Every structure is written in C-alpha cells, then in structure tokens.
Amino acid sequence: PDLRDRIGKMLKGRREEYFLQGHLCTIWKDGQYKRTRQIDEVREGFEDMLQRLCTDSLEVGMIHYVDSLKDWKEVYEGPVMQYARELKAQGKIRHIGLSSHNPEAAMEAVKSREIEVLMFSINPCYDLQPAGENCEALWDDKNYKGDLVNMDPAREELYEMCSKQGVGITVMKAFGGGDLLSEELSPAGRALTPSQCIH
C-alpha cells in the first residue's frame, strides 16, 4: 500500500501524463499482495487502489494471474468478469486486461474478445517452454536441459492471435527476475544482454 500511496502523491496534478495499469483480484493480506476471486475482496481491493493512487480511473484493469483453463472459465463466467464489464461501462477502466503465464489459458481469454490487453511472461528462455499451469516450471533448471531450439508453438500462436485481434501485450519477466542477465543463473548457459532479452 505504501508504494501506491507514494505513486498517488506523485500523480497529483499530473495524472493525464500517465497510462495506468492496475490489477483486479488482488488484496493486501498478511503483509503482501495476494490473489483473490472473492468478489467482495476484488471490489474492495480495486477501490482501495484507486483511492491510494488518487485517481478515479485506470487505463487498464488487469485481471490478475489466470494460469489455468479452469480459473479462466470461473473468471469469465462468474462475478469477476461481470465486475470488470461494470467498471468499463462506468469509465473506471478503459480496457479490460488479464495477466497469465500459460499460453493456453491466455489464448482462451483472448478468444473471448473481451480481453484487450494481455500481460504475459515473455523472454527468450520462457518462450521455449511448453504451456503449463505451474509458472514455477519456467524457472526450473531441469526444463532447460533438453534441446530447446524453437519457440513453443502455443506461445507463437498466442502472440499471432493477439496481433491479429489487436490485443496489446505488456511484458512481464523480460529479464527472468534478473536470472537471464547472470552467467551463473541464466538457463541459456551464459548471460544475455538486455537487447537479447527484449527480442
């Protein structure tokens, strides 16, 4: 919350200069942000964020962390998507977004035609990995031991689908939490440059 308070102070009198993207489905609990699908918590978390940011709207309301087809179905058919639609109709968010690490779940979301912005984990190493519901697998050294020479077809299909449908992509984990820039930690076996990571 402190970071949002500080950003809110900085935005005063300058809000129109910034494009804000914020998560739906996060709450502050036990000293950290956590994912929730409980609609009362989703509403409370979003209103708290607007208040702390000293604004009445965001450019993107990003539905947080949808990494399985089951979770996407629950979000899409349940009160979370309905709430996102309401926020958009009220002008509290301009675009509905979604964050994911799983190309299969992300593709289903993009196919709905309601997701206008996708936050997705993209970098030269993750792009070699197959779809999965466990995002921790993206960091697991054993998943980089085989011959990985081509982009995963599901990821490639997702990026092409977003391009064709005009869905914006915001990138997370471009440097893999810094691991890709480290010769010791990079799954590529050597340190990559920032330019290589932002392929």
What is each PLM-predicted segment?
Residues L24-R43, L69-K73, E183-L192:
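Active-site mouth loops of central-metabolism enzymes
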Residues P1-G22, D56, Y83, A89:
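N-terminal binding-site loop/beta-alpha segment at the start of enzyme catalytic domains
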Residues Q21-Y33, M62-Y65, V171, F175-L181:
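N-terminal small/glycine-rich loop or linker at the start of catalytic domains
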Residues E17-Y18, L58, I93, I115:
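Local beta-strand N-terminus motif with an aromatic residue
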Residues M10, V66-H199:
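Beta/alpha (TIM)-barrel catalytic core signal, keyed to glycine-rich beta->alpha loops juxtaposed to Asp/Glu
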Residues D48-W72:
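Active-site groove signature of glycoside hydrolases
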Residues D40-L50, Y83:
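Short, well-ordered amphipathic alpha-helical segments that serve as non-catalytic structural scaffolds
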Residues P1, Q21, S57-I63, G97-L98, ...:
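Short beta-strand segments at enzyme active-site cores
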